[in-house]
UniProtKB/Swiss-Prot annotation:
This is Tubulin beta chain. GO terms for biological process: microtubule-based process. Residues 426-449 are annotated as: Disordered. Mg(2+) binds at E69.
């Protein structure tokens, strides 16, 4: 079967990861003790994608948990599903990375990385046909960003032909946890551009907005935010785990969504999202889901798809529905909003249909879009980066761990290149192919920016 090895790193990654395992254990009928308590054969049919069956019918997640301090791990271990994980798969240091990317990537993290890779290798060897890896981490801190990207590049070296998918929490526009977020995030993006196949971009502020606006929660907690993310994570891998009429997997997703190798940063959304009170006033239909899924307020990261154009997009539906209706809706969206899709990739919507809806819903849809609007995200981080880097603020924390200023300059220009690439394809049209000169295009894009 097509197994996926899940790696979570740092505080944010471990908290999202823990929530994700709660969600899919619930879907597959796995109790917190690891025993099967479900009621349908479908739950077990492809359970091996995320779980390994141990002796006595116990199901163990193919998960590797890493952190540079024991705190978050302890709370995962004592959390509701803490007994699910294999104790050897908790790999942690004692020092912490102190929000310092260099500590995570070069010093503290580098000391721990071999023991993490041993566990990853062990999990990968336990698979019949490994499909790929999914990593949850944040880019603002030290461990998830520094050590997370170190792990990604090491795994890339060892398994070059497997898909590497990450769920990366970017720094939010207004809410900042750390002053040095722009540094950490820029250095991480520099790595993700080269070593990941698909990056789902998430940020806390957009998640808070969804909780306030759509779910009408007055005081959303990180638990609520992580629940949103894990709903989307579960949707992306759903068709690997349950039978469906139109299957998709990580590789199909990558092939359909990545038109140019560097542009693999995706917006994700999930529908239906309704507040508790108004659920019974809405019918769940394919048109209704399609409408909500394309709503800018539904995106889990703070860039507005209306400010750019979709290169490609993908809708993964779950539940009993007619595939014909799904196809019609997809076509309908593209025709009505044709200006928001680039015209030089015809039919750039992929859809998948999986028969089993998530717990408590009749049908749902997960949306993954490759939009040029994501450049807003990078531009914002890049501006903050430049403001600090020009004054060399906080730089001694990084150079003290052996980093070179050159690396910062490289990461900065890589990020700016990424922004102008997105801009170039946003402006490109189907006709001008002949006279379109590469260099000229990039210059124009920078002028426009």
């Amino acid at each position: 079967m097509r197994e996926i090895v899940h790696v979570q790193g740092g505080q944010c990654g471990n908290q999202i990861g823990a929530k994700f395992w709660e969600v899919i254990s619930d879907e597959h009928g796995i109790a917190p003790t690891g025993t099967y308590k479900g009621d349908s054969d479908l739950q077990l049919e492809r359970i091996s994608v995320f779980y390994n069956e141990a002796t006595g019918g116990r199901y163990v997640p193919r998960a590797v948990l890493m952190d540079l301090e024991p705190g978050t791990m302890d709370s995962v271990r004592s959390g509701p599903f803490g007994q699910l994980f294999r104790p050897d798969n908790f790999v942690f240091g004692q020092t912490g990375a102190g929000n310092n990317w260099a500590k995570g990537h070069y010093t503290e993290g580098a000391e721990l990385i071999d023991s993490v890779l041993d566990v990853v290798r062990k999990e990968a060897e336990g698979c019949d046909c490994l499909q790929g890896f999914q990593v949850t981490h944040s880019l603002g801190g030290g461990t998830g960003s520094g050590m997370g990207t170190l792990l990604i590049s090491k795994v890339r070296e060892e398994y070059p032909d497997r898909i590497m998918e990450t769920f990366s929490v970017f720094p939010s526009p207004k809410v900042s946890d750390t002053v040095v977020e722009p540094y950490n995030a820029t250095l991480s993006v520099h790595q993700l551009v080269e070593n990941a196949d698909e990056v789902q971009v998430i940020d806390n502020e957009a998640l808070y907005d969804i909780c306030f606006r759509t779910l009408k929660l007055t005081t959303p907690t990180y638990g609520d935010l992580n629940h949103l993310v894990s709903a989307a994570m579960s949707g992306v891998t759903c068709s690997l785990r349950f039978p469906g009429q139109l299957n998709s997997d990580l590789r199909k997703l990558a092939v359909n969504l990545v038109p140019f190798p560097r542009l693999h940063f995706f917006l994700i959304g999930f529908a239906p999202l309704t507040s508790r009170g108004s659920q019974q006033y809405r019918a769940l239909t394919v048109p209704e889901l399609t409408q909500q899924m394309f709503d800018a307020k539904n995106m889990m990261c703070a860039s507005d798809p209306r400010h750019g154009r979709y290169l490609t997009a993908c809708a993964l539906f779950r539940g009993r529905m007619s595939t014909k209706e799904v196809d019609e809706q997809m076509l309908n969206v593209q025709n009505k909003n044709s200006s928001y899709f680039v015209e030089w990739i015809p039919n750039n919507m992929k859809s998948g249909v999986c028969d089993i809806p998530p717990k408590g819903l009749k049908m749902s849809v997960t949306f993954v879009g490759n939009s040029t609007a994501i450049q807003e995200m990078f531009k914002r981080v890049s501006d903050q980066f430049t403001a600090m880097f020009r004054r060399k603020a906080f730089l001694h924390w990084y150079t003290g761990e052996g980093m070179d200023e050159m690396e910062f300059t490289e990461a900065e220009s890589n990020m700016n290149d990424l922004v102008s690439e997105y801009q170039q394809y946003q402006d490109a049209t189907a006709e001008e192919e002949g006279e379109f000169d590469e260099e000229e295009g990039v210059m124009d894009a920078e002028g426009a920016a």
